[in-house]
Amino acid sequence: MNSGYNPGNANHITSHSNRTKNGVPTIPQPALMASNAILTIGPYKHRKDLIRESVLTKYQIIGYIAAGTYGKVYKAKSKTNGNSNSNSALMNDNVISIGNGQKEAGLQKTNNESMEDKNQLFAIKKFKSDNHSNKNNHDINGNEVIHYTGISQSAIREMSLCRELSNKNITKVVDILLENKSIYMVFEYCEHDLLQIIQYHSHPDVKPIPDFTIKSITWQILNGVTFLHKNWIFHRDLKPANIMVSSSGVVKIGDLGLARKFNNPLQSLYTGDKVVVTIWYRAPELLLGARHYTPSIDLWAVGCILAELLSLRPIFKGEEAKIDMNNKKSVPFQKNQLQKIVEVLGTPTTKNWPTITKYPEYSAFQQHFSNTYPPNLISWYKLIGRTSKQCLNLLRCLLEYDPTIRITADDALTHAFFLELPKMSENSFEGLSQKYPKRRIYTHENDIVSNSQHVNNKRHGYDDNMTRKRQR
């Protein structure tokens, strides 16, 4: 039998009697095979590219909002009235929707629908490509060739987490697009963020944020954080610029680029990200070099945000010691930031933080903080003109040195502060006499497709020219 004969192949001649011609044996013909060109990925990718909708086909870019380390954000509106998002069904499948249980019954409901939803407005985040180019590397036509090394870890994290999470206090992703090696994440649009609101109340004149608004915003932040923690996720970058608020006063936690699952990590938290949380909102255990930490780092950040809502300025505004670019494996000791914390909360001791001696930077801490500072939080609270004892108690519970006894997000939701009048609402703006200005949009910089970089619009915190001493 000829070795090329395969009785299981229907394309071969299956009968021995048919393999002769005029009594002379013939050689079986091989099976019909697709050409290598058809089997390669190129034609398939080309066909997919032809049917894939582009970002400009689906969305009209209204203007440019801001830039950060991740990339750029644009305001846009749908060209299809929200009825044909390619990934909408994908976003609604396999979502986790726990965390809105009985505790939410205490929140006053409102009938105001978000105007952002009615007008189908979106925020489109364009991630920076993880690429590098060589000026001496050109094609045969003399055009510069850009080599792409892949998708950033931050983009992968945010995409994977946002597609699985569904909670009204977490910013919702409605679409993900890949075009020309750029990734676009499309989120529901929020007209405000806490940084913008704080700046409105502090400039040019100081106008304290009403207690009702602070209470409603804080409760909704804690509700979103509770949802994340119940799903084994910590945010790791909570700060005012990452807390969005819709025009109807609903809080949305955004920017999950540093968020991470903590129930079964593939590598240690420190190995993956040596520096997490913006310096002013970074928990003391992180400042002391903790290699392993817990979701309590998010609660410290919430405490810092609450204090900032109360006082209209960061409570611990330290200066960050930068990483030595020649030794990126070494994280510098953040003496100045710890100094700001100690001045308000007092010097931590083994009495109020028994495990402090276990942290890698404890010896450096002892060296720089030989003098003992007394607790000063009550004086700080009185100085800013606040009077609620329960609010002060919640703040103390959130800004607890020892992470093992720091209040959890779930317990904070039922703190006495939220039970006393005025009762909070899902509309944080309810009853306000003023309306907050809309987010600033740069309409002359709306080219979302180009790779040009915008500067001076980062939203990481206060610029020096945006802060001043509060009038006493």
Swiss-Prot record:
SUPFAM superfamilies: Protein kinase-like (PK-like)
Binding site for ATP: 65-73, 125
GO function terms (MF aspect): ATP binding; cyclin-dependent protein serine/threonine kinase activity; metal ion binding; protein serine kinase activity; RNA polymerase II CTD heptapeptide repeat kinase activity
Main location: nucleus
Cofactor: Mg(2+)
Example of a GO cellular component annotation carried by this entry: mediator complex
Active site: 237
InterPro entries named among the record's database cross-references: CDK, Kinase-like_dom_sf, Prot_kinase_dom, Ser/Thr_kinase_AS
UniProt feature, compositional bias: Basic and acidic residues: 460-472
Function: Component of the SRB8-11 complex. The SRB8-11 complex is a regulatory module of the Mediator complex which is itself involved in regulation of basal and activated RNA polymerase II-dependent transcription. The SRB8-11 complex may be involved in the transcriptional repression of a subset of genes regulated by Mediator. It may inhibit the association of the Mediator complex with RNA polymerase II to form the holoenzyme complex. The SRB8-11 complex phosphorylates the C-terminal domain (CTD) of the largest subunit of RNA polymerase II.
Family as reported in the entry's similarity comment: Belongs to the protein kinase superfamily. CMGC Ser/Thr protein kinase family. CDC2/CDKX subfamily.
Assembly behavior: Component of the SRB8-11 complex, a regulatory module of the Mediator complex.
Protein name (record): Serine/threonine-protein kinase SSN3
Provenance organism: Debaryomyces hansenii (strain ATCC 36239 / CBS 767 / BCRC 21394 / JCM 1990 / NBRC 0083 / IGC 2968)
